[in-house]
Amino acid sequence: MAGQIFDAAANQSAVWAVILGAVLATAGGFVATQMERYVEHHRRERNAALFFGELLTTLQIILYHAHNAHDRGDPFGPITLRMLKSARKEIDIYDRNRETLFDLRHGDLRARIQNLIIRIAMPIEGVFDATDEIQRCQDQLRDAVAIPRPDLEERVESLRQQRASGYEFIMETVEALPKIIGDLEPLAHQSFRKLGEIGRNI
């Protein structure tokens, strides 16, 4: 009788050991999976912060040089327009990688980046459109040199004002870049200040 009781107790202990082992294995697997997800999420967030930090720093450098060119000679001469086209290319890179933005966990930061890009992209397109339209109007004025065209002259002046306003809006928007870049630095575990300084001194 005592042996039977002992065997039953031993069997019960074995069952509990199996159950405990299964629970620990499940818990261990769950913890390992969660840790893996945590590490992967932070890796992706760091890569995203590096990407957007470098992209926005490059955009800042390009627009810095565009502003310098704008203040010398023809405000919207070939150099200024070339710089603005380079800025547009950086925005195109952003557009192609926009889904990476969701790897940043801070919704406010994501919104600020997206809003800033839109506020720069739209007036840049406006500058290009106005420049092309001004050129067309000036070509028409040259072709009709013997015939006064006050309507075209007024159109050219209006387009120039629109272009100047769009450019000023771009430069005002750019002032928000340093703060956004600074907020990306802790996530990227890297400072972008040196890159910006080198770019401005080129």
Regions found by a protein language model. Name each.
Residues G53-E54, T58-I202:
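Interfacial alpha-helical end/capping and short helix-turn segments at domain and membrane boundaries
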Residues M1-E40:
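Membrane-embedded hydrophobic alpha-helical segments
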